[in-house]
Amino acid sequence: MTNITNIGFFCQGIRVVKITDWLNWATFMETTTDQWAVVLPMIQRGSVWKPHQVIDLWDTILRGMPFGGLMASHIPAVSTLEFFHPLKRTLVNLPANGGLSLIDGQQRTLAMLIAWPAVDQQMQRRIWVDFGEDDNYDHLLRLHFTTESSPMGYQRGGPSGQAIGRLSLAERRLANATYADRMAAIRAAEPANSVKLRYLHDDEITPWHSTLALDLRLLIERHQEGAQALRTYVENQAQDAKVKLDARITLIKAKHVPFDAYDDALLEAIISHLRKRITTIEKCMGSSERATRIHVLEQGLERMTRQHFPVIEVPEHLMHAEEKDEKKDPPLAVLFKRIGTGGTDLKTSDYVFSVLKHLNPKCHSLVETQLKSTQISAIYTPTDLVMSAVRLVAAQIEPEKDQPKLDKAQFTRLLRDEKKFQRKTPKSPASLLNSTNKLGSMAHL
């Protein structure tokens, strides 16, 4: 019998992995002697999955359905290549067994990690199970989704594959007004760069269109303790949710700050919404439907613990290879574009940032340093900042040419000019840092 650990992670170009093992490896939790680290390569797509995609994936997992294979490359611990931790924007050191550089399946892995207990409150997204109502379409359970940018959630989801709309402007205003005191308290207690994340994970706040929604991450945590622990947790949370809503109504009626500034119409709209939720929770607590939904979740989580999926090998030489023809993309970028034709394409901005990080990993830390300023991060995404900086560098090289929409071909031409662009960016990041600093100064104006 072949000893896989002696020849690397894969056997004949593939390996079947348990979901739970994969998620533990992605959080660097050592739960077995066969320990690996799931890491991300320098080439990445900047976009993330939409709410309905995350919900559909979790429904697929809870049903025990296959969700396709992933692609990865086994990188030895002695490799000189650099990689990112899936949960953090930091470079990582590989463990003794090396790392699994995830080429295809980044979004599926990140979507699964949203609800994995070991992640705690690091994720900027949450997924919820609503024990107060059924799903009216083709999902096992009513699932909700919240993010840093939409902490009150979205509209109720529809059939599989159908996009979920944002809350209306009126709904967002009403929701924000309902919990304005929580945001004020968090702003007073937290550093500016962590306010949104803390607000997302605040115990008081649940999706606006939910009834009795509980964080799936905490539900999985209780399920790992035992079936009775999960049932007890849901029962206690149902009682607690009603108490919290009653207390909030009392607080609003007393017109404490900031509710003292609200007019009667706004106060009545908030109280009406909260009372409606209390009534629905009371109805749920008096029926057998809640117990049925708990049982459905238990079955789904049991299926998850037994579920496996294939990881297909991407040969390690593709991670190092450079295209000899300067007019063509390196092999790894070609692979990314081809596997992206059925999912999320590799945008020009993602490609430019990825190539710069590949040529000089310090570019990553330069950008992250700038984005620590909330005044900059409020204006620029990482790729926006890089593309603007690249344009500034290009303008220094060819002042007479402005390239407002730099494409891959133009960027490739800049890279080919070693005496100019490469001297200023990959080999010496001073110019790119200088450019990002200039952009940062502009953001402060």
Q: What is each stretch, according to the model?
A:
Residues T2-N3:
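Positively charged N-terminal leader segments that act as targeting/secretion signals
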Residues N6-C11, V17-W22, V352, P382-L445:
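A cross-family structural signal marking well-folded subdomains
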Residues F10-S47, W58-A395:
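Basic- and aromatic-enriched surface patches that contact anionic nucleotides/nucleic acids
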